[in-house]
Amino acid sequence: MYKLRKVDKMNRRNFLVGAAGAALSTTMTDRTLGMGIEFHKVGAFELRKYSLKNMAQAEMLHNYLKDAFIPVAKKLGCGPIGVFEQVNHTEIQVVHVLIPHRSVATAFELNQKLSQSKEHLEKGEAFWKATPANAPYDRYESSLMSPFHGMDHLETPDVKSQRIFELRTYESHNDRAGFKKVDMFNIGEIDLFRKAGLNPVFFGQTIIGSHLPNLTYMLTYPDMAAHDAAWKKFIADPEWKKLS
């Protein structure tokens, strides 16, 4: 028996913090936007969600990402890569990895190239030789996204100080409704976000993944007080009320 899902609404919202030393490191910069924000041209985004059972898995996964995956993926043209831990948990249960690609084609090629990289296999040896009883994660999900025309790049904030990242997913009941929501962002909603202090990191329309059709985006703030103030300002904006 299947249960009907309510759609055309914000279905998921997660608050994340950047994992130490790995949150959107700002190499491969194309342009500086000012105020510590950097601009990175992107052809496609991959978003991975690793589910973990314990801190031992978290440590093994982070060591692999830091020592093997991120350095080699950068050499293959990906980046800047972001690693985020979900907050409001006593233990790390979910780790999100954001991987910007030059194109959809390079996204499909990444895993094969990693499997052929001697450096990747050697530096990630403990990860790859882990037994089923000592697996580095339970499972992971992956989605591939196309950047919006209204923001076809990644914006990385200054991550020297701690920040909150908000990952939001909006599901639609059919593709036409999904494209209409993307258009709403492109023609004005992104600009209204910026005006209110909702600082965007990326916007992506999911082309491969679960719960389609959907779009996903990430915002960032110095802290939760700034988050609350920005959303309050956005919701009260007369221009948003006209657009919606």
Feature annotation, model-predicted:
Residues M60, Y64, A68, T106-E109, ...:
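Extracytoplasmic/secreted proteins, especially bacterial periplasmic and envelope-associated proteins
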Residues L16-V42, G77-E91, L121-Q162, G197-H211, ...:
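Glycine-rich beta-strand-turn "strand-cap" elements at beta-sheet edges
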Residues Y2-A23:
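N-terminal secretory signal peptides and thylakoid transit peptides that target proteins
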Residues V42-L61, K66-L76:
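Mature N-terminal segment immediately following signal peptide/propeptide cleavage
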Residues V72, I235, W240-K242:
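Intrinsically disordered, low-complexity polar regions and short flexible loop motifs
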Residues P147-A225:
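Surface-exposed interaction/gating patches
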Residues A44-L52, V83-S117, F165-S172, Q205, ...:
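Short, well-ordered beta-strand segments in beta-rich or mixed alpha/beta enzyme
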